[in-house]
């Protein structure tokens, strides 16, 4: 019986251990003691806890098993669960009240055990539930000590960080460095010898030690190899930190260990900057003594002396000056240290600087002097100091602001008083003629204004646009200021140039109190703007109801007629301000008031579909039948616009649907014209006549047939419209449809009974018309049904028949003060752009008009108007209004934006039209300004005139251009070529040349054959124009007008093949004969060439060219080293004269002012330079002073020469440098100036990041840029700006946008005329809470501190909202991780394919991932817009097809030059380097999936430089950007450091930088040598007769390794993912594809199963890799390439490659197998590293056996790795060490793996395998192709060696494999 009980107890324990709950409960029901235990004291709870059976544990606890029962070793269930890492069990036990700090016999706590085994989750849970990590073992060791000893860094970091103040999350070594804990640091370094481990913020422990001035740990780190110059991504080195902290000993230590003294942060700060900014004089001195660069500049141009001045560090300033720092050194913004001191108010520093000679009047880039800044910042002591030391009180900024302007705007009354007392003028004006009073009024500073008025400031002072201070005050609504100004004599009725009074301004802004104050002072309501708007009009326009109410209460006239007779009610209706309409109507606003064209407010409401407004107007008596001048009613307009609801409303209010206008057009006619069927339905239902005729007899069916509206034709026919109705010309609807070529309508009309044989009044049938006009389809339809006998012969000319239409317009101007700018600068017939849209809706569709010589003149093919939607229009006008109404501000000078407008649609030819003896003219549809005028009686016969553009590269011989000449226009090809006209014709060509400095002229070149070019001459001048026009009604602008529009007029009697405009320097020419003569320059009158008799033997044309040399250009380039005379050239050059000719050239300015000597030849500083190079070659200057005699007279030098050439005088004291200086200067002088515009496109990729595309273009081809097709939005367009050919253009961003700099990417590009000069700038938003906008400036030079910058263009940009679709960025994200996905493309794979297949495979990947970027790539590969559009048209449905077509086209074009490197470069340039990395980088990364970033790979994030130009005065007065920076500190939450992106650090615990860690109460080490290790409890049960059938083996591989995946004991899943960048299954690519496609042969399956007994296990382990290959092989293009090479890849070894089949691999690889136990699982990880020429190739295969083994040994034998069954062991360390980025060499490092298993005696055996390359073999010349193997074993056979602390043996094996190469 006792035996049965023992069996039952054992069976119960076995059930508890295996988790068989039912069996265990049965035993308990049968009376088994729940607390029974085995021979080691383990009860059911212990066993279930160890195995992790949560349900069993919970049930046992419910059954009241004793929770705190201990084993013989003193372990509770919590100890055992913690040791085994069973976190769920740990939670249950703790929740049931288990003692978290219970100690076993030797003092081990559960926390100690979990820390020892690296169970991080258990450690975290125990700590959170009261575990005390300071409870030590009997030996005095804490959990931290054992975790340190075991090298569990994550656990160490958590233990150290837990419970500390703040949220410190630094890695363990950093904590040790912070606490100067050398002992802990030493142990940590023993476990991981890398001392340069990075924190989350990118700092090393040495950085931390430097910050906390911990010298001991710093020395330890340096001794252990810490990099003293380690540079994280932000560029901050330990020396920077030590210099900032001020620890002299630390700085000396770092310098002694080789710290680089010139190292710079990402913002270019040196250690000297840091020391100077914090006032550390001693450190500054040490650094200077070690050679620190005293003039080093930060990114913003700050030098150390600026830093010291900013920090008010007097001693530092003195020290730097003592070491010869430049006292007036300047930043990028040209701020000197004195500016900085003035900005910060540091009086003492300013005094020292001034005493040492600083210039008190130095000007910043925007013209601010230190005095301006002191006045702005209200530093009165600094201001007084500056004035005492000579600062100019009248100094002005770039925009003309004096210190008094600045102080007045900022409202600093004491400063204002002081300045006025010191003699500043109260009425001084800036460039916009604004006084300080304007400034004070605009900013609302009443006290300042009052004081200025007391000091004789003029209350009515007028600015440039006649704005007074009262306008400024009224605009901001500052009633107090308004009253003050009115009390001091300000006139309330003074108007600006646009006619606005202060009351208009207040009305616009809606400032009621301000308006009331003005009205009380008798402000006139009758004053009108230039467009006739009263204040009430303005209030009505902007919807200011309260203000309109106030004006009406003060007797405003509600029906005052303004411009074009518009009343306030018209304006309110036009702007849809319903509240204003409802206010005006009861107050007497008349709904009947007509505008000049008879439109009532109801007409406007009807046209704009404003239902509520229309109801209000009708309610107050508005007539639904009111007629305009042309008889148009509101119903006409609503019907034409297609507003069904409005039509129904008007008809319900007695509108007459049959009422025609003056031409008889009814609403139904207009509906038929536009095709609005629903409106036609409403009209018919209300009884409208379906066959109403116009004056010319057109019915609605005629109109619908003419305009091709087939649905309406059907509708009218359904409602019994007369299908054969005739017009007065006898045209039926069938005639109209035939004339317009509408085949479908012709067919429909015939089906509905239209007679095809009807003839018009001149006897024409529809068939005859169709034939005459060439409509083949219509002819075919009509031919069948028309009676041929009725087709009468007609004359050649067909008279077109057009229905009438409405052609009146109403200008309800969107802008009461200024003209809106359209595509033309001039206005057209006083029409407003918005209303031209309305006009276009009424006029016939010109693109449907058939050309015919019978019509004398046809208007433009494409009317050159700009259509702006009403809301856009209002916005545009508002911006324009801002400029006219704002008191002038620097923004209006510096911002170069103009309103973006849509470009017109382009047709094929620029011009193409027929002309006969009556003449005609045509404007270009694409180029504004292009026009061809053929006067009457010029053509002998009907002629088609064409005009098109020609690319220079298409010409046989482009126009020959000297270096100072350039093409000013596109090359124009006119047709017919060689046409001769009876009298002159006129061609006007737009050009883009700038007159530069006034020294250039335009020349027309012509070519008859494309090879020879000559100057075009015409004997007809401008005076002949009227005679040439021959009575033609064509307006020709004057030469002045053409010059403004940049149009060149050519008068010619024939058409050559080509015309082109050339820009060159002005020349004065004449014909010189044997009698001699002279030429004098008109540009520089002192320049003269004299030709004596017989210098030439026959009459020849000679020219004299004089090019002035501006002094400022010489100064800018050369300083005061030399001065120059004008350059004088006799053309043609290189001509020899029979007698010497005389030349006179003015002397250089410096020589004229102060002749240095009267010497001659080489002794004089005056040098004569000459270049005899002719033609188009570059000038080569030489000094001919020694061989030419100069005679001085009247400030000129005279000399003679036998050869025509270029001559130049230079006054250069360094005579040897004269030629060099001249060459430099000449290069700048010869650059051709052009007028170009900057256009900016933008797109946001997400909320913070976006892209800008900047264009600098001459002719307007914006709509052809690729950005139009890629969801970019135009955000800015500049006015025309002068740029020079070849000029580098540098872009600078400021404001809330920051450029993101990529490696080797510059934000600059060069201007080339007639090219799309393009620059891509990736940007990110600095502050997402503010508007994503800023300023983009273009400069001639990069922002260096020494350059005085001239800003070419300053654009205000706002990024468009992010429109995320299935865009490129989304698509790119789905590709990650690319290196893992495309391991198929690594070198190891490609090595087995042919070169062709390799290229094709790569091309396939490129085209698959190019997506929308293909168009960018096309641009980068220099494909034209036409090519890109053709690709787009030919492949409309697929991006893949478009990418494929592009790459094919590129390969065809490049031929042999199509190199992958070129393609990679292009991909990088368009920001698609991830594709290149995917293709190129996988081979390099084969040793490590996630390599450490190289320390040198810093991605600098550029901070914006301040530019000259501000959006408003407030911006101009803001602190300069260069002063807005924070100081370096690695641990404080400083903005300076926080912008750094975190680089991939070693995967430690999450880290943050914060406060100091207190570790004084935390015991780490005790006196013991090393911490004791806990051994696991023996859970084996004694043998019994009862079968062990209760055990339920759980072979879950994932579960087996889940506990190892957290620490250094990486699970297999991690391993496989880490090694699959370049790895594959044993058989490589082909076998992998075979597995994926189910095509592997049976033989292969058998081979594999020989070594893999459970293939499912392998698949689950390598699942990441399997999925990768599944995805890539699903890709059709890659699959296609791979399939072609599959035959080869399946049999690599036959071709002498290095791969082996599985059986060979098994034989050649090392393996240890234990075949004990009933079940065997193998996990196989194979690494193939690609063949590199001449290098050793490694092939490694690891077989890991997983077994079940029930240990039967003595009770005391326990597994050291407690908690893991022997069957569930895993490798203790990763299979391969990660290699640091900087350590990646050709020779792989050692790789160490450890494996543990239990031998037959129950001992724990540890096998350690060291794999390393023994040597490298140069296989390039190897003949022997046999495989070699070297195996070295270390250790005494396989006899176990005991390892201290563990029972077991260590087997060390080194294996390497080398192979020859065929």
Curated annotation (Swiss-Prot):
GO terms for cellular component: ankyrin-1 complex; cortical cytoskeleton; membrane; sarcoplasmic reticulum; spectrin-associated cytoskeleton. The modification Phosphothreonine is found at residues 862, 957, 1374, 1376, 1396. Residues 824-834, 1489-1500, 1637-1647, 1681-1694 have a biased composition (Basic and acidic residues). The modification (3S)-3-hydroxyasparagine is found at residues 101, 229, 427, 460, 625, 658, 724, 757. It comes from the Eukaryota. Residues 886-900, 1648-1666, 1695-1720 have a biased composition (Polar residues). Regulated by phosphorylation. The modification (3S)-3-hydroxyaspartate is found at residue 691. The modification Phosphoserine is found at residues 425, 755, 777, 813, 830, 852, 1078, 1386, 1388, 1424, 1473, 1482, 1519, 1529, 1612, 1660, 1675, 1685. Residues 1399-1483 form the Death domain. The keyword Repeat applies. InterPro entries: Ankyrin_rpt (IPR002110), Ankyrin_rpt-contain_sf (IPR036770), Ankyrin_UPA (IPR040745), DEATH-like_dom_sf (IPR011029), Death_dom (IPR000488), Multifunctional_ANK_Repeat (IPR051165), ZU5_dom (IPR000906). Keywords: ANK repeat, Cytoplasm, Cytoskeleton, Hydroxylation, Lipoprotein, Membrane, Phosphoprotein, Repeat, Sarcoplasmic reticulum. Residues 1387-1862 are annotated as: 55 kDa regulatory domain. Residues 909-1064, 1066-1212 form the ZU5 domain. Residues 1-827 are annotated as: 89 kDa domain. SMART domains: ANK, DEATH, ZU5. The keyword Translocase does not apply. The modification Phosphotyrosine is found at residue 1069. Gene3D superfamilies: 2.60.220.30, 2.60.40.2660, Ankyrin repeat-containing domain, Death Domain, Fas. Residues 812-834, 872-900, 1481-1506, 1598-1720, 1744-1767 are annotated as: Disordered. The 55 kDa regulatory domain is involved in regulating binding of SPTB/spectrin (beta chain) and SLC4A1/erythrocyte membrane protein band 3. This is Ankyrin-1. It comes from Mus musculus (Mouse). The gene is Ank1.
